[in-house]
Amino acid sequence: QLGSPTALADPETERRLREAAARGGHTLYVPRGALWGCEDIRRMDEGGTLAALKVTMTKAPQSFHLEGWLQERLAAAVAAGGRAVLYEGPLRPLCPLAPNNVNTMAAAAVAAPSLGFDGVRACLVADPSVPDWHIVEVEVTSVGDEGRALSVTSTRRNPAAPGAVTGNATRHAFWSSL
């Protein structure tokens, strides 16, 4: 079992973990944590109907524990005092910059291997107006004919202690997904 799916953003780590599990006759289990709709995403991916997946995570600035240039972007957002998009793009490059904050996004990449860490879109938002909430929005789009496709958006509002990296309900969601 893997506690932090963000670790799988490193292809070598993922390869070594999967090989070790296979040698022992096991499967590498990745809990979904705060990812709502994980089973539906997986079914769409397996059925070849998943076209796009975007996960947006919005938290108070003090709930982020960031690395590298994202620390500077967060500091600028705090100084400006308003809502700020810290990152928007493919998930893989975000993982080492926010390893404590993007496990839900990483679970989405694992649930949708056809998209993976390079195809899942990630958006990280710092918003001081939500000091005690972590908000996860998952946008799923299917393949479609003539520009018409199924689209599903879910929003999960998780109460959180001010400054907490993990919301109150996430711990229970993690353990219940085992």
Where are the regions that the model predicts?
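Active-site-lining helix/loop region of Rossmann-like oxidoreductase modules
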Residues: 26-178
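Conserved acidic functional residues
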Residues: 1-2, 89
